[in-house]
Amino acid sequence: MSYMHSLNLMLQNPSGIDKIAAILVNVARLDPASSKSTAQLVSMLNEFRCILRLPGLYKLIVNFRKDSSPETYMSNAINIGYYVTEGLAFLGGKQIISISKPLEDKLWLWSSRFWLLDTLLTIYQLLREKTEDEKEHQLDLASNLASLPLCIHWSVENGAGLHKHQIGVLGLFSAIVQTRKLILSLHNKRA
């Protein structure tokens, strides 16, 4: 599995493009003396990631009732809440829809709270389930545990006290683990 082949697979997939953007955003956060142009790049990549997620709401709604397991139902409901609040906040911030700035800020907070709920549910599921691939299972758990402080930080007004560098380290670890998992999945689909 060559790096170029993996990169090519990633660039052909919206989730792959999102993971590449997440890695770039978090690498940029590691530099405490980052320039104005780096901050603008991070902002642009974060906006790009929001745009990539907008169509995901349709898939969540279409598949909402296909699986009757309570955990899947709850996960889908949480993610619909996340996608709706993030999408409305993003579109409001871009003045595509008309909402007040205080409402936009509340929507961003609620999108982070839905992300927090999803992360907690995922951690719960990972702690409960047994798997054949223990290494992948542990990496999944570690990735979600790394995301947990980020979710908490962005779920409270004015943040929970994480510094930009800490956000970068936690986000980068999580993004790398998620990227590795996605690459393996994309290669397995091609096989």
Swiss-Prot record:
One Gene Ontology biological process: peroxisome fission
GO CC terms of this entry: cytosol
PANTHER family to which the protein is assigned, alphabetical: MICROBODY (PEROXISOME) PROLIFERATION PROTEIN PEROXIN 11C (EUROFUNG), PEROXISOMAL BIOGENESIS FACTOR 11
Protein name (record): Uncharacterized protein C1F12.04c
